Curated annotation (Swiss-Prot):
Molecular function per GO: ATP binding; ATP hydrolysis activity; ATP-dependent protein folding chaperone; unfolded protein binding
Superkingdom classification of source: Bacteria
Gene symbol of the encoding locus: hscA
InterPro entries assigned to the protein according to its UniProt record, in alphabetical order: ATPase_NBD, Heat_shock_70_CS, HscA_NBD, HSP70_C_sf, HSP70_peptide-bd_sf, Hsp_70_fam, ISC_FeS_clus_asmbl_HscA
GO biological process: iron-sulfur cluster assembly
Function text: Chaperone involved in the maturation of iron-sulfur cluster-containing proteins. Has a low intrinsic ATPase activity which is markedly stimulated by HscB.
The protein, known as: Chaperone protein HscA homolog
Lineage: Bacteria, Pseudomonadati, Pseudomonadota, Gammaproteobacteria, Pasteurellales
Signal peptide (from-to): none
Family: Belongs to the heat shock protein 70 family.
CDD domains referenced in this protein's UniProt entry, alphabetically: ASKHA_NBD_HSP70_HscA
Keywords: ATP-binding, Chaperone, Nucleotide-binding
């Protein structure tokens, strides 16, 4: 199969013109910025030669601090110090309050129900906080590179939905950045390893950061990067390890934090203990008047359920990719939390091989994003690399009977556009409602609604005569647009899917699993619904035919017989016996065959009345 070379928007017009571009890893705990210099992707350090910028913003009465300076204010002024804002972006206020009730911030709702954090500098949205972090990274980049940036590639977790992706782009625009592309974090890591280490074959990218977990199964071959399957958990990361240690300390000392400052101090101590346990067999935590020692074995026992949860997600991703674990040739470790020895040990046992850690797991995502940014601005015009991300959940449309017709199946590579034709259900129908859905189940009630719109202006026709073409298009950033067009008049309507908030953590992890758990029941429910829809169609057409021609073409006994069979089908349709409905449809079809033939003959006779044979032969 031939591969097409596709020029990306924003490429340099002149091949010799070098444009400044960077890759940004906008992380939950830390963020980094990288660029390609002299053909190599490198991390750009700040003025103190620090590569990691804590994803923290402090909004003081007189000044705003970003990064390490802000992090140092976390225990002193927690209400005005925003950390892990990536967990909040694209979420509703009720979702944030239910999921993160321990956060020290005061929240209010914006006009559209999104969370605003009350600070000394006024209410701040997660988009604004993220924008301040991006501004800091932009400043570091322009100071190091000595010029203005032409564009940036920003990485996001593979499981970020439309709302979270759009919010990330909005934050970048607020910071004055030209976003070339949003890139899935595991894909960026694979890109970095593919160029630096020359890996080919099936690769698993295990990405455990501060706040999110992602697993991607990729095929790398001759410069082509293809994501076969993805999985993830937007509420699993190193922060959760910290909270487990903190809870353990509370259990040991019987002392609970009484203030937000104490809570933040305890979390900081837990984080320091976790880092110590990476290299040492034990760590001492001094909390208030107590000192407790936690061993690496105790720590491993605490985090075991979370590590196991990540491996179950890996198992599902392998199944989606139709790949056995022994087929995986390499396992790439990404994210600072993969430094935990127990994580590396368990991942190695699961895949049956020692994970790759030759590139700093904290930096690999930013390095890969920088390579992609360099290509997108046209600095690497001879690149034959093709990078293919995927749709993580199927996208579909509601059809009659509450069924879901999948237009773009999950794990389809993006960007992608798919179209399908639909028709009207009733005679004279002049409008059609388009209900856009996301998920793997067969029924509308079991999937997530993304949006609705109505196509109006359909010419009145007989049921089934109109042709409405519905097109689903997902761009390179994973954002969806849907268009419906009536083919004869070209009248159309469309929608861009930008939900006001994202999936809850339970929904993200449960949607795919539920499709497996309920596969048999879903199939039976779909078949029953399809039979009911067919019964409705037959009933509707018979009623219309009886009203139009029954009195003229049928005897009284024939009319009553069809009515009786019709009522029997209407009754049996209310039940859940699929076979009985099918038999009822067949019985009504048999009962109306002679009636249908008479209607056809009457229609032909009417069309021929008053015409000569020559008129028919030579129209």
């Amino acid at each position: 199969m031939a591969l097409l070379q596709i020029a990306e928007p924003g490429q340099a017009a002149a091949p010799h013109q070098h444009r400044l571009a960077v890759g940004i890893d906008l992380g939950t705990t830390n963020s980094l910025v990288a660029s390609v210099r002299s053909g190599q992707s490198v991390i750009l350090n700040d003025e103190q030669e620090r590569s990691l910028v804590p994803s923290v913003v402090h909004y003081g009465v007189e000044e705003k601090k970003v990064g390490l300076e802000a992090f140092e204010q976390a225990s002193l002024d927690p209400k005005n110090t925003v950390i892990s804002v990536k967990r909040l972006i694209g979420r509703s206020l009720p979702d944030v309050q239910s999921r993160y009730s321990s956060l020290p911030y005061e929240f209010v709702a914006s006009e559209n129900g999104l969370p605003l954090i009350i600070t000394a500098q006024g209410p701040k949205s997660p988009i604004e906080v993220s924008s301040d972090i991006l501004l800091r990274l932009n400043h570091i980049a322009e100071q190091r590179l000595g010029g203005e940036l032409s564009g940036v590639v920003i990485t996001v977790p593979a499981y970020f939905d439309d709302a979270q992706r759009q919010s990330t782009k909005d934050a970048a625009r607020l910071a004055g950045l030209n976003v070339l592309r949003l890139l899935n974090e595991p894909t960026a890591a694979a890109l970095a390893y593919g160029l630096d280490s020359g890996q080919e074959g099936i690769i698993a990218v295990y990405d455990l950061g501060g706040g999110t977990f992602d697993i991607s199964i990729l095929r790398l071959s001759k410069g082509i990067f293809e994501v076969l399957a993805t999985g993830g958990d937007t509420a699993l990361g190193g922060d959760d390890f910290d909270h487990l240690i903190a809870d353990w300390v509370i259990e040991q000392t019987k002392l609970k934090p009484q203030t937000a400052n104490q809570q933040r101090e305890l979390i900081t101590l837990a984080n320091q203990a976790k880092i110590t346990l990476t290299n040492e067999k034990s760590a001492v935590i001094s909390w208030q008047d107590f000192s407790v020692e936690i061993s690496r074995e105790q720590f491993n026992e605490l985090i075991y359920p979370l590590v196991k949860r990540s491996l179950l997600t890996c198992r599902r991703a392998l199944k989606d990719a139709n790949v056995e674990s022994e087929e995986v040739q390499a396992v790439v470790m990404v994210g600072g939390s993969t430094r935990v020895p127990y994580v590396r040990e368990q991942v190695g046992e699961f895949f049956g091989k020692t994970p790759l850690t030759s590139i700093d797991p904290d930096k690999v995502v930013a390095l890969g994003a920088a390579i992609q940014a360099d290509i997108l601005v046209g600095n690497k015009t001879d690149s034959d690399m093709l990078l293919l991300d995927v749709v993580p959940l199927s996208l579909g449309i509601e059809t009659m009977g509450g069924l879901v017709e999948k237009i773009i199946p999950r794990n389809t590579t993006i960007p992608v556009a798919r179209a399908q034709e639909f028709t009207t259900f009733k005679d004279g129908q002049t409008a059609m409602s388009v209900h856009v859905l996301q998920g793997e189940r067969e029924l509308v009630d079991d999937c997530r609604s993304l949006g609705r719109f109505t196509l109006r202006g359909i010419p009145p026709m007989a049921a089934g005569a109109a042709h409405i073409r519905v097109t689903y298009q997902v761009d390179a950033d994973g954002l969806l647009s849907v268009t419906a067009m009536e083919k004869s008049t070209k009248v159309q309507a469309s929608i861009q899917i930008k939900p006001s908030y994202g999936l809850t953590d339970e929904e993200v992890t449960a949607m795919i699993k539920s499709s497996f758990d309920n596969a048999q029941e879903d199939l039976q429910a779909r078949e029953l619904a399809e039979q009911r829809v067919e019964a409705d169609r037959v009933i509707e057409s018979v009623i219309v035919a009886l009203q139009a021609d029954g009195a003229e073409l049928l005897s009284t006994d024939e009319f009553h017989h069809i009515e009786t069979v019709l009522k029997q089908l209407m009754d049996v349709k209310q039940g859940s016996d699929r076979d009985a409905i099918a038999q009822g449809i067949k019985a009504l079809d048999t009962a109306t065959q002679e009636f249908a033939a008479r209607r056809m003959n009457a229609s032909i006779n009417k069309a021929l009345t008053g015409k000569n044979l020559s008129d028919i032969e030579n129209p």
